[in-house]
Amino acid sequence: MNNQPVVSIIIPFLNPGHWLTEAIESVLAQTYTSFEIILIDDGSVEEDAAIALKYCRRFPGKVFYYMHESHVNKGLTASRNLGLAKARGALIAFLDADDCWMPAKLTEQLGLFETMPEVQMICEASLFWYSWNDPEKENNIVQIGVPSGVYTPPQLIKLLYPFGEGQPPCPTGIIIKREVIDRCGGFEESFSGIYQLYEDQAFLFKIYSTEIIYISNQANNLYRKREDSMSSSANNLEVYNTVRKFYANWVEGYLAKIPDHNPIIDTLLTAFKKSLVYAETQPGITL
C-alpha cells in the first residue's frame, strides 16, 4: 500500500504464560509492518508481566505495556477499553493472548480496506486450533455464518448469532477503523464475570447496527481451543441462559437510547426474547 496506516493491536493478558510470547511473536512476524502492539496487563503474575516488559525493551516505540491502577484485575472489556484509550492507530485489531496470527493477516485485511473504502470493519474466518495440545487432532477452518461479501446494517444482526443462526466472528479475526469505535463506543464493561461470555456480542451488535462490514472467508488467525476457556462455560446451561437474558436486557436498554434505530432490530429483539421464554419451558434446550 502507498500510504500505510498504523494498526493498533490490543492484546489483554491474564496469566497466559508462554502463550503470550507466541501471540506477540506472531504479530512481529507480520508482513505488514506499520503497527503498534499494546499489551494490557489485567493483573497477571510477575513472570507474565516480565514477558511483556521484555518486548517493550526490545521494541521501544513499537510495543507498549499498560496495567490497570494498582495492578488490579478488571476483566477483558475494561482491559480492551484501556487499550483503546492508549491506541494511536487509524485501525484497531484485537488478539487474545492465547491466540496467534498467520504472517499475512494484516496484509490481506489492509488490502481489502484499500479496495473497499466504504467498509468500516472486516471480519474473517478462524482456524480452530486443536493441534497445539494434541498433534493428532485435526484443526479446522470455521467460516463466519454468511457468504463472503459486503453487508449493510442491520443485516448481520439478523443473520449471525445470537439473534441469527450463523457463526459469529472471533475477535482475533476482526479489524476495524478507529473512527467507528469513536462513533459507536468501545466495549461494554457491564459484561464482566459470567457475562463476559457475551462481551464481544455486545460490541459487535453496536457495529452491526450502523456500519458497513465485509465478511471474508480467509482464515489468517489461530483460535486456540481449550476446555478452560470462557466460551467453554456456554456448556453450562444455566449460566448460558442467564447470560442470554442479560444480553437481551442490555440490547433493549441500548436501543432505547437510539430513537432513530432501524425498526427491524426491534422485531429481531422481540423474537429473541420469545426464544428465551421458550427455552425456560423446555429443559435442556438452548436457542
Model region roles, listed by residue range:
Residues 1-28:
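N-proximal low-complexity "stem/linker" segments adjacent to membrane-targeting elements
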Residues 13-21, 41, 45, 102-103:
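A structural helix-start
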Residues 25-69:
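Acidic donor-binding segment of Leloir-type glycosyltransferases
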Residues 69-87:
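Glycine-rich, basic loop-to-helix element that forms the pyrophosphate-binding segment
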Residues 85, 143-239, 243:
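Conserved nucleotide-sugar donor-binding catalytic segment
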Residues 92:
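Short aromatic/hydrophobic "clamp" motif used to bind/position activated sugar donors
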Residues 96-100, 125:
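The conserved acidic donor/metal-binding loop of glycosyltransferases
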Residues 104-143:
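Conserved donor NDP-sugar-binding/catalytic core segment of glycosyltransferases
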